[in-house]
Curated annotation (Swiss-Prot):
Class in the EC hierarchy, top level: oxidoreductase
HAMAP family: PSII_PsbA_D1 (MF_01379)
Localization, UniProt: Plastid, Chloroplast thylakoid membrane
Binding of chlorophyll a ChlzD1, residues: 118
Any one GO CC term of the record: photosystem II
Function of the protein: This is one of the two reaction center proteins of photosystem II. Photosystem II (PSII) is a light-driven water:plastoquinone oxidoreductase that uses light energy to abstract electrons from H(2)O, generating O(2) and a proton gradient subsequently used for ATP formation. It consists of a core antenna complex that captures photons, and an electron transfer chain that converts photonic excitation into a charge separation. The D1/D2 (PsbA/PsbD) reaction center heterodimer binds P680, the primary electron donor of PSII as well as several subsequent electron acceptors.
The organism of origin for this protein: Pisum sativum (Garden pea)
Site (Cleavage): 344-345
GO molecular function (one): electron transporter, transferring electrons within the cyclic electron transport pathway of photosynthesis activity
Membrane topology, as annotated: Multi-pass membrane protein
Residues where pheophytin a binds: 126
Protein name listed in UniProt: Photosystem II protein D1
Length: 353
């Protein structure tokens, strides 16, 4: 009888724990995805802060030329970064216990792998937690779907691209100037500016900014007057009020006359779906583009496409970009290569004797 009571007590304890984890009454919703999200994001954040401040230089290219990335080793907020794991490690899983010592682990850039893998797990669980909370509250699941765009983008630059290139050393450094360096080298090696999926991503980001500004300014300009001239217009809204706070008919009429009638939404629901979908689909395509270029399916090559009747090349913008690409490729990893791969011989010279 005692054993039965103990089992019931443990079931009740487990039941109370489950109820607490999945309760929507908590100030911050935890959820089952949160059980994994919280420790992974805390780990990634803690190691990032410590490494950004104090990590020793990392042999990123695997040629015994360490690169400094932390504040205590001469960097500032702009130049500092978590240097990617060494090319000598490649794609190997490199936890602390795989190294002979902590010094070796730091020298080979172990913190980068630790941060990136925990971060990707954490943001994926954050997306799952968004779906989970929506499910508990009886909401539709599109918040998590929208968040999948930045998750896909992060996964592309931190995981898919290194896999395609064969080494975590090709992943994006965790810093401001490191991000710019990654972008420049990516252009040099993959001609991303000439990739249609990147173009769709640019349209998504810039278009999303434009549509957000248009929507916000239209709504703000067509508020229903509830205040005097001496009060802020924001005081005319009360949280949870049933009536509309702006006149959508006026906004529709204004924009329809500014552009043309069918350029203006007359359905608030379809309008807000469009505002969400446009940037999300654009970033999806960019992430897909990074993931294909990871395996060297690169942007369009229109170099020397135009020639005159004598066969002489007439330079186009594509040729100007190509010259810039070659210059950027020559300059990056300058001690690891004698010349850029694009200029290498197609066949190795034969060796006699």
């Amino acid at each position: 009888m005692t054993a039965i009571l103990e089992r019931r007590d443990s079931e009740n304890l487990w039941g109370r724990f489950c109820n607490w984890i999945t309760s929507t009454e908590n100030r911050l919703y935890i959820g089952w995805f949160g059980v994994l999200m919280i420790p992974t994001l805390l780990t990634a954040t803690s190691v990032f802060i410590i490494a950004f401040i104090a990590a020793p230089p990392v042999d990123i290219d695997g040629i015994r030329e360490p690169v400094s990335g932390s504040l205590l080793y001469g960097n500032n907020i702009i130049s500092g970064a978590i240097i990617p794991t060494s090319a000598a490690i490649g794609l190997h899983f490199y936890p602390i216990w795989e190294a002979a010592s902590v010094d070796e682990w730091l020298y080979n850039g172990g913190p980068y792998e630790l941060i990136v893998l925990h971060f990707l797990l954490g943001v994926a669980c954050y997306m799952g937690r968004e779906w989970e909370l929506s499910f508990r509250l009886g909401m539709r699941p599109w918040i998590a779907v929208a968040y999948s765009a930045p998750v896909a983008a992060a996964t592309a630059v931190f995981l898919i691209y290194p896999i395609g290139q064969g080494s975590f050393s090709d992943g994006m450094p965790l810093g401001i100037s490191g991000t710019f360096n990654f972008m420049i080298v990516f252009q040099a090696e993959h001609n991303i500016l000439m990739h249609p999926f990147h173009m769709l991503g640019v349209a998504g980001v810039f278009g999303g900014s434009l549509f957000s500004a248009m929507h916000g300014s239209l709504v703000t300009s067509s508020l229903i007057r509830e205040t005097t001239e001496n009060e802020s217009a924001n005081e005319g809204y009360r949280f949870g009020q049933e009536e509309e706070t702006y006149n959508i008919v006026a906004a529709h009429g204004y924009f329809g006359r500014l552009i043309f009638q069918y350029a203006s939404f007359n359905n608030s629901r379809s309008l807000h779906f469009f505002l969400a979908a446009w940037p999300v689909v654009g970033i999806w395509f960019t992430a897909l583009g990074i993931s294909t270029m990871a395996f060297n399916l690169n942007g369009f090559n229109f170099n020397q496409s135009v020639v005159d009747s004598q066969g002489r090349v007439i330079n186009t913008w594509a040729d100007i970009i190509n010259r810039a690409n070659l210059g950027m490729e020559v300059m990056h990893e300058r001690n690891a290569h004698n010349f850029p791969l694009d200029l290498a011989a197609v066949e190795a010279p034969s060796i006699n004797g």
